[in-house]
């Protein structure tokens, strides 16, 4: 009986360790949307207001305004490749830093996600030209 309880507890611990990293990961759809230049998918993760820094735009914008600015950016800078360089976070907030290679050059991408009602929302997005 004790052996069975031990196995159950051990199994639960292993499952917890395997599952818990996925909660701290950046949603794959965000990475794909940046990689593919899909403003529609990316904006579905925008908070109602987004602090946005993209080219000459640097302000807090509504979700709709931010979507339009990002759409214009992707139209002018066709994405070729995107990869996450670093990510981290704590207490319901996560961030990622990535490198976006486009038809016009390479950009550093930073975004901050906060969780609300078990969903992740982008509160801050920065896309800045490198070099």
Please tell me what each predicted stretch does.
Residues 25-38:
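Short, aromatic-enriched amphipathic alpha-helices that serve as compact interaction elements
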Residues 46-48, 56-58, 86-88, 99-102, ...:
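A mature extracytoplasmic/lumenal domain signature
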Residues 68-106:
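Surface-exposed, charged secondary-structure patches
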Residues 28, 46-81:
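Short solvent-exposed beta->alpha transition segments
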Residues 1-27:
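Bacterial Sec-dependent N-terminal signal peptides
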Residues 41-43:
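Solenoid-repeat scaffolds in large eukaryotic assemblies
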Residues 106-131:
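Short beta-strand edge/turn micro-motifs at domain boundaries
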């Amino acid at each position: 009986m004790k052996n069975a309880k031990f196995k159950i507890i051990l199994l639960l611990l292993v499952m917890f360790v395997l599952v818990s990293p996925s909660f701290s990961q950046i949603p794959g759809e965000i990475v794909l949307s940046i990689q593919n230049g899909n403003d529609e998918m990316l904006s579905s993760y925008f908070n109602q207001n987004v602090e946005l820094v993209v080219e000459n735009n640097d302000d807090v914008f509504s979700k709709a305004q931010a979507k339009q600015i990002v759409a214009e950016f992707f139209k002018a800078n066709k994405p070729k490749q995107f990869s996450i360089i670093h990510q981290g976070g704590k207490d319901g907030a996560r961030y990622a830093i990535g490198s976006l290679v486009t038809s016009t050059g390479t950009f550093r991408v930073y975004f901050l996600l906060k969780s609300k009602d078990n969903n992740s929302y982008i509160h801050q997005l920065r896309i800045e030209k490198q070099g």
